Amino acid sequence: LRVAAAFVTALALLPSQAQQARLDEVKATAEEAYLYGFPMIVGYDVMNKFFIDRDSGQFKAPINTLSNEARVFTPKDTAISTPNSDTPYSMAMLDLRAEPMVLCMPVIEKARYYDVQLIDLYTNNFGYIGSRATGNGAGCYLVSGPEWQGEKPPGIAKSFRSETQLGLVIYRTQLFNPADMDNVKKIQAGYKLQPLSTFLGKPAPPAAPAINWPKLTPEMFTTGFAEYLDFLLQFAPPTGTAAVEKPMRDKFAAIGIGADRKAPPKTPPSPEVKAALGEGVKEAFAKIGATAEGVGTTVNGWQIGSAAGSREFYKGNWALRAAAAKLGIYGNSEAEAVYPFTRSDASGIVLDGSK
């Protein structure tokens, strides 16, 4: 964990009352940072298993490559907690640093629902393609990163801008019944994902620098979260619509998040600071759980509502965004789908997946 040496030294020199005030500040900052970053860390866990670690047991495809799965998910698919079972998935992790990516859709019969969900590294849904949003006709769509300054080229129906350099695209194609799977396969074969340069028939720009991906550890969800959030935020510049978050993110530097990544390693935190960080994480996780319990309204024992959406939907409510990641990361926005949840049966007995 990268905690500034000066900060640690200052704690050691302060009188006890002032030192406690600073420890309280560390705890509060850790709580805020964990609420803010929890969805990003959960998302990295999924992306790493699906698109980065070829030995994860759930690897699907390299980055910027579309993976089609003409099957329904089963309990063995553990990376995402609540996948659909009637909309076979196609997925891709996007790296938009070098250039935009172009997504081309085939004609899909009007009776069949499909959607293509565009998700940034924050887990905000920043755009949709599909039956509701754009219709079932053929078309090509451009997805760019935050720094891209180009114009929408000919042949592109619509452009989408991600606030982050890394993102995810999830396709859902309706399956009418088991015998319909071959039709789903044909539709999935018509989905195309390619770099803009390939779409235009031009030379590719220079490749983006290689990324040293951190390995997954249990500590990434506890006291080690700051290292992972610090790593992820380098791909999420606080510019454009994300600029409103800069003052908050500047505060995170006190616990080693967002500090100068080129600086030498910082002094490890003292036991007191580490304990304060742990308390902040504990408070944040409790708040995430409480927020998840309160999502939507209860109807006949079912908790019905949506915790997933765009930046505009969340309005800075980081606890709600974190609750969405806890309930089922990468959920659709409410305009696209509604998710009923329950934890007990009609008799009030808590459901147990092991049975």
Question: What is each residue range found by the language model?
Answer:
Residues R2-A12:
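Bacterial N-terminal signal peptides
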Residues L14-A18:
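Sec/Tat signal peptide C-region and signal peptidase I cleavage site
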Residues Q19-K355:
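A compositional/structural signature for long, glycine/proline-rich flexible linkers
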